Structure formats: structure tokens, C-alpha cells
Amino acid sequence: MSALGESRTRLCDQFAFVSGSDSAVAQCYLAENEWDMERALNSFFEAHMDSVFDEEAEKTEVTGNKRKDDTAEASGTKKKLKTDNADCIDLTAEEPTCSITVNSKENQAENGTAKSEVEDSKLSIISWNVDGLDTLNLADRARGLCSYLALYTPDVVFLQELIPAYVQYLKKRAVSYLFFEGSDDGYFTGIMLRKSRVKFLESEIICFPTTQMMRNLLIAQVTFSGQKLYLMTSHLESCKNQSQERTKQLRVVLQKIKEAPEDAIVIFAGDTNLRDAEVANVGGLPAGVCDVWEQLGKQEHCRYTWDTKANSNKTVPYVSRCRFDRIFLRSAKTAPPVTPDHMALIGMEKLDCGRYTSDHWGIYCTFNT
């Protein structure tokens, strides 16, 4: 095969991986767009993604009553997360009730302290690649995400692989959150801030100049309990053969973490697609920056966020278990240190549709501030 043929074959493989399509579809869109990856992906998304939630809305109108009956009949038969409209959420409340934050007066008296005060001082986050590019059961899976938001009521949510229709769905339901995105074309990242807990100051988008997959770095400046925070998320270049580009993007991320003001806490969370050797190749994390999973003792139960052995959303002929999704923390130099408190994987329950919320597990993490 010629060098040109090999190059185009690699482009087709990358397009198919990112878009969730096959090589024939990839070749068609790439050829129509002069083998420009970004143009081809944009063309694909415009053609395929916009109608996903519209179709689901029509389906819901017809089958809404029946689905309530079916859900009732199915309850207790299998371990599944309930996502019907009644149970899913009302995220409109500023202080939703959930098992994590509710404490009875009796328990508070028994313990001698008001636990809610302790909980209020903790910062909670969720980071999740929601696989918006997979349109199968996408509305069901978006409702699943909303159920987890209602359960955990995180202060900050970092999301990757969003599409415009998914964002509009979330904005209609998660009205207690401020939402901003890394783009409005194709697929992109986003950050959600709980309005009653986090004050937004400003945001910026840092482009990765040589990305072939529309990737960038989204940064938000906020305050939490009077403390300045820099929140960052990204979806670094995918695929094993994109290690060089992914490493370049990691260098940009780490440089931006180092450049943040000394009086600010920095939290980066996202789908890095990183292998440990790639982190080592850039000299490891800078002084003062920690990998939260490592800081918490490298707990095995929350190591693999991409796990085709346990997660059946993607049909692949091999087992792949990787720690693609990572959280980096840098404390402020001129303020009391922030320490990781707890980390867990979420999204490990199947939804009523028989699939998981995403092909990635989400990460729920809390910090002592």
C-alpha cells in the first residue's frame, strides 16, 4: 500500500472510532471533505445528531403511559437504575434531597456536631465522558445521567463527548446548574456549576492547534466558599496511535495548571486517554500537582474508567481496561491546602433500556476545603 493509502486508512480508522461509525461511512465523509478530519466530523454530526432527542420526544408522547406501567411491573426484577420522568429528577430545587447530604436532627445531636456543616465545606465533583456520539438509547442514557446528578448533587460536573442536542436536554432539566460548553459544533466538553454553591467568574477555551479530533481545553474561573478555583476539562486525542498529539495536549494542560494564580486551587478532570508511560514521557506531573487517584492510595475499585470487561455498551472483540479518565489537583500556595477526600466510580448500574449511561464509568470525587 502506498504512503497516501496508509495515511487515508489511518484517517478512516480514526474517524470511525470517534464517530462510532464504520470505515465505509468514514471514507465517504472524508472523501467528500477532501480528507480533512475536522470538516468531515462536523459534516457527519450535522447530518446524524440533531434529531436524536426529537425522535425520542415523539416516541415518549406515544408510549409515556405504557412505559410507566412497564416500569412498575419490572421493578425488583433486576438491578437497574430507574430513569422514568417521575423518578429521574427535579433538579430545579436549589437544595435537592439525596442520601449523601441528608442528616437527621437525632443523628446530629448524637454526634455532637452538625454534619451538614462538614458536608457543606466539601467540594464535590463528577467527571464523565457521556458518549454522546453513540445515538443508541441516547435519551434514556441522558436521563440516566440526570438521575446521578439528582442523587449526588455535585457542585461541579465535567462532561466530555457532548453534542448540542444532549446539552439542550440537560439545560431543560438541570436548571439549578449553570452550563457552558467548549464549543457548539460537532462534539465537545462542558462544565456544569451548581448555582447555589459555586459562583462563576469567567471562562476561556484554549485550542489545541494540531488536533485532528476537534479537541481543546475548557477553563472556568469560579469561587467556592470564598476560595478561588480554576476548573479545567478536556478530552485529549483518542486512539493509541495518537500518542504524540495526546502528549502535546497534556503539556498544554499542565502548563495552564502551572500558570494559574498562586491564590487559586486548580482542578482538572476529564477523559485524558492517557497511558502511564505518556505521563512519564513529559517528566511526570509538575511539583505541587497530584493525580487524585494516586493520592488516595491507588484504590483498585476505581482504577479502570474504561472497562470493556464490565461495560457492555461497546461491542469489541477484545478486553480493554484503562484509566483514561483522570483528576489532577493543585492546591493554592497562599491558602490552606485542599485534600482529596473520597473517590468512587458511578454509572455501573444498567438502565431500564438494558445499557449503561455511557461506555465510560463516571468519577465522583470529594475534596476537603
Curated annotation (Swiss-Prot):
Q: Tell me which GO cellular component terms the UniProt record holds.
A: cytoplasm; PML body
The organs and tissues expressing this protein are described as: Expressed ubiquitously during blastula stages and throughout gastrulation. Shortly after shield formation, expressed weakly in dorsal forerunner cells (DFCs). Between somite stages 5 and 9, expressed in the tailbud and around the Kupffer's vesicle at a higher level than the more uniform expression in the embryo.
> Which top class of enzyme applies to this chain?
hydrolase
Query: Where found, per UniProt?
Result: Nucleus; Nucleus, PML body
Residue ranges that the Swiss-Prot or TrEMBL entry lists as coiled coil: none
> Mind telling me which residues the site (Interaction with 5' end of substrate DNA) is annotated on?
187, 306, 324, 360
Q: What UniProt keywords are attached to this protein's entry? A: Developmental protein, DNA damage, DNA repair, Hydrolase, Magnesium, Metal-binding, Nuclease, Nucleus
> What is this protein for, i.e. what is its function?
DNA repair enzyme that can remove a variety of covalent adducts from DNA through hydrolysis of a 5'-phosphodiester bond, giving rise to DNA with a free 5' phosphate. Catalyzes the hydrolysis of dead-end complexes between DNA and the topoisomerase 2 (top2) active site tyrosine residue. Hydrolyzes 5'-phosphoglycolates on protruding 5' ends on DNA double-strand breaks (DSBs) due to DNA damage by radiation and free radicals. Controls gastrulation movements and left/right (L/R) axis determination via smad3-mediated regulation of cdh1/e-cadherin.
Protein name per the record: Tyrosyl-DNA phosphodiesterase 2
Task: Record the organism.
Answer: Danio rerio (Zebrafish)
Q: Which gene encodes it?
A: tdp2
